[in-house]
Amino acid sequence: MALYLQIVGIIGGLYLVSTAFKILSRYSRSWKAARQHGCKPVKRYPNREPFLGSDLSRILKEENKRGKGLEAYANLHRTYGDTFAFKALSPTQLSTCDPKNIQTIATTNFDHWGVEPMRGDTLAPFLGPGVLTHDGQIWKRARANIRPTFNRAEVADLENFELYVSSLLGLIPRDGRTVDLAPLFKKLFLDTATEFIFGRSVGSLVPDSPFNALEFMKAFDASAIGLALRIKAGALKPLLFCFDKTWEKSYTQVHNFVDNQVRKALQPHSDLEKTEKLGHDSEQREKFILLDQMTKETRDPLVLRDQVLNVFMPARGVSATAISNIIFELARHPDSWESLQREVQSINGQPLTFDLIRSLKVAKTIVYETLRIHPPAPMIKRVALRDTILPTGGGPDQLSPVFVPKGTIISVHIYSVQTDPKIWGDDAKEFKPQRWAEGKPLWESKWQYEPFFAGPRMCPGQQMVLTQVTYLLVRLAQEFKGLENRDEVNEYLALGELTVQSKNGAKVSLTPAR
């Protein structure tokens, strides 16, 4: 017994010495940075429970349940500044909405920041190594594989996109009944995402489709929520989720679907099969299919599954969320819907080409404004891969550089910077598309409006999202002259962890144009 206590005492002593050494080393590096670069400490959120910050975590959790989590977080920035430190069931983290710091993280010191220490092991059971979870060579190779998917030819393939849009329009009631468009939009972009990734659509918009889209989307959403919760839990993940089997059940269902697609892609195809895979038109040009491209790099089914899921994860959600939020706002702002109607009527039956879509000023301002107040990914997290410096945020005036030790997690709060009254004026939180057409806007200075983030890790599908969402918006305005809100709750209640959508969907009634 005495020997056991001695061993425990020695181990405990070594742990304390190691911890003390790490703390002293961090303070030493911070002191040197302060002397060399003029770094000063940031303001801190005054946690009442200072060890883990459970008090702030509890507050944010309650606000998220109410659908007010984004606003609560933005209020922290209004109170404690554009860059501050906090604990929320975590070691000390940073949060910033300062444009200079965002630029530094996204581009200037891009290689100082990453995601792998934070996401790699945590997300491995579902996503595995890929563009969302890793840094370095794994990220570079994955990024190079998906880049051809989003070249102009693929982005501008609106003729094929129209096939899916027509199916969606045919499912919208034309008798004034209330309809929640959000689930239909999710089905639409599930179909388009599966086609450009796998070469074949699951056909969720097709009546009596054998594919159970609702069950699959439910499993995928549960998998995504599980990811976000585990990232948020950080070091407490093993304790909080050790007995949770529901996440595994959900992502296994998603894995089974993707594994089936991978098996098909690895099978040799005849020329006839390749033609059928492209669609009914035998003269249709050969398309870039992401999974086929990946099979040229590797034949490992597990690697292919991981790479596909890292693309499928954002591809299926961002566009559906964006168009749902647009309809949410237009149903509450009839003047903006009427302006869109006038612009659409001026098209006079011209084909909706890529160039025409880009020229529609009213539609563009509506899309931009919605992405400003409802960014699909309102918070971007990064971890310092080395000791580094942020250019601003330190000291009482928050204008001095800030020393950031290796391993520190920072939240880039896109929602806060895109609704900051200092940048956008007192009406920053109002839906006001006309602000984009009024003179030379302040936000032409970059880093104040980044709904898809920026730099090497910006969303590679940005142009595709903007093109398809604008096209769908125009087609809805062509097909329906009346848009009426049917949601009993008028305010926007946010739901979600990785991407944020309206808690109540997009409940409207539509009146046909003819």
Swiss-Prot record:
Bilayer topology annotation: Single-pass membrane protein
Record InterPro entries: Cyt_P450, Cyt_P450_E_CYP52_ascomycetes, Cyt_P450_E_CYP52_fungi, Cyt_P450_E_grp-II, Cyt_P450_sf
Binding site for heme: 459
Pathway: Secondary metabolite biosynthesis
UniProtKB keywords: Heme, Iron, Membrane, Metal-binding, Monooxygenase, Oxidoreductase, Transmembrane, Transmembrane helix
One GO cellular component, as annotated: membrane
Enzyme class label: oxidoreductase
Membrane-spanning residues: 1-21
MF annotations from Gene Ontology: heme binding; iron ion binding; oxidoreductase activity, acting on paired donors, with incorporation or reduction of molecular oxygen, reduced flavin or flavoprotein as one donor, and incorporation of one atom of oxygen
Localization: Membrane
Pfam families documented for this protein: p450
Enzyme Commission number: 1.-.-.-
Required cofactor(s): heme
PANTHER family found in the cross-reference section: CYTOCHROME P450, P450, PUTATIVE (EUROFUNG)-RELATED
Function: Cytochrome P450 monooxygenase; part of the gene cluster that mediates the biosynthesis of the dimeric xanthones cryptosporioptides. The pathway begins with the synthesis of atrochrysone thioester by the polyketide synthase dmx-nrPKS. The atrochrysone carboxyl ACP thioesterase dmxR1 then breaks the thioester bond and releases the atrochrysone carboxylic acid from dmx-nrPKS. Atrochrysone carboxylic acid is decarboxylated by the decarboxylase dmxR15, and oxidized by the anthrone oxygenase dmxR16 to yield emodin. Emodin is then reduced to emodin hydroquinone by the oxidoreductase dmxR7.
Family affiliation: Belongs to the cytochrome P450 family.
Protein name: Cytochrome P450 monooxygenase dmxL3
Organism: Cryptosporiopsis sp. (strain 8999)
Gene behind the chain: dmxL3
